[in-house]
């Protein structure tokens, strides 16, 4: 497995060579590609059946199967991410937090937050940024990890070295029906989770609802590679290596096969931009990481 220092160095080199791609709602003209992306976004919203990897299943069946899958992998979830990304997911999450720039007093909800990777980084970085910038707040920084799977939340609570002085709370809840009042949070995130939900449009609407005016939504997710040669190499690694590694290291071939398939079925970067715009987010943008192996999407509630 890649060590933290070498991983971060590799990640930063990759990020430095890949320009961010941004699309801001209402700016400039709309191209044919944008029209096509909007059409695919609308189609994705209105289809009755949904994808479980490459299978078409009913929405009820998908939610049940995803819940069972993550219950089975909860104790090895971080290993699952390490295998699928060669450990680089940790660097991508660090970069996401750099993009968020947490400050003291801000309130975060991490939707489908699993074992709390983003919440822990958010709380820690808010303190660091406050000291560095001389920013203080009478309100305490808070991060809520909301996940539908109690096994994932339990794995997060049991993580070694977890210490946030009560700033992190753990809430069982469905991303499609968040158990929170409207306009509660400054930042909403979902990291490597949205491709597993049944109705992405409902999740996006819920994220929009619970954000305060001026709040920001960030989505970090595996995406679509924009380099043909790299795409072929990535497909080979994904379909021929990841399931085998899942079997060897976690004793679970099927979960890792689903992981690969779910990535391929996730909307491409521009389609997801249109889905965010359809929800109501403004100044929507995305940044490719490693030529689109992953991407960070950002939208504002204005």
For the regions a language model picked out, list residue spans one by one:
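A short glycine-rich, Lys/Arg-flanked "PGG" loop and its adjoining helix->strand segment in the class I
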Residues: 201-213
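Core SAM-dependent methyltransferase catalytic element
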Residues: 279-302
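N-terminal auxiliary segments of SAM/dcSAM-dependent transferases
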Residues: 11-68
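C-terminal alpha-helical "lid/dimerization" subdomain adjacent to the S-adenosyl-L-methionine
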Residues: 220, 224-279, 285
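A short SAM/SAH-binding and catalytic strip from SAM-dependent methyltransferases
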Residues: 186-200, 223
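Class I SAM-dependent methyltransferase SAM/SAH-binding core
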Residues: 107-178
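Conserved alpha-helix/loop element of class I SAM-dependent methyltransferases that forms part
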Residues: 72, 76, 86-107, 121
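A short acidic, Gly/Pro-enriched loop at the edge of an enzyme's catalytic core
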Residues: 176-188
């Amino acid at each position: 497995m890649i060590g933290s220092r070498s991983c971060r160095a590799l990640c930063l080199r990759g990020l430095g060579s890949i320009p961010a791609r941004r699309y801001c709602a209402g700016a400039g003209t709309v191209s044919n590609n944008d029209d096509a992306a909007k059409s695919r976004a609308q189609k994705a919203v209105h289809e009755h059946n949904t994808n479980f990897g490459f299978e078409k299943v009913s929405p009820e069946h998908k939610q049940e199967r995803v819940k069972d899958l993550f219950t089975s992998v909860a104790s090895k979830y971080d290993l699952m991410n390490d295998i699928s990304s060669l450990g680089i997911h940790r660097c991508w999450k660090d970069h996401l937090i750099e993009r968020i720039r947490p400050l003291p007093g801000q309130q975060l909800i991490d939707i489908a937050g699993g074992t709390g990777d983003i919440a822990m980084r958010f709380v820690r970085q808010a303190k660091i940024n406050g000291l560095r910038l001389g920013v203080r707040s009478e309100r305490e920084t808070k991060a809520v990890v909301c996940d539908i799977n109690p096994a994932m939340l339990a794995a997060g609570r049991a993580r070694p070295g977890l210490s946030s002085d009560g700033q992190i709370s753990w809430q069982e809840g469905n991303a499609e029906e968040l158990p929170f009042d409207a306009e509660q949070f400054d930042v909403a995130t979902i990291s490597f989770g949205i491709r597993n939900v049944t109705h992405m449009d409902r999740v996006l609407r819920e994220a929009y609802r619970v954000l305060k005016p001026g709040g920001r939504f960030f989505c970090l997710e595996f995406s679509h590679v924009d380099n043909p040669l790299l795409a072929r190499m990535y497909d080979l690694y994904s379909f021929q290596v990841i399931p085998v590694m899942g079997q060897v290291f976690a004793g679970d071939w099927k979960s890792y096969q689903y992981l690969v398939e779910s990535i391929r079925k996730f909307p491409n970067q521009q389609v997801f931009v249109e889905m965010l715009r359809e929800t109501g987010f403004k100044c929507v943008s995305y940044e490719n990481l490693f030529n689109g192996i992953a991407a960070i999407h950002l939208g504002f509630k204005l």
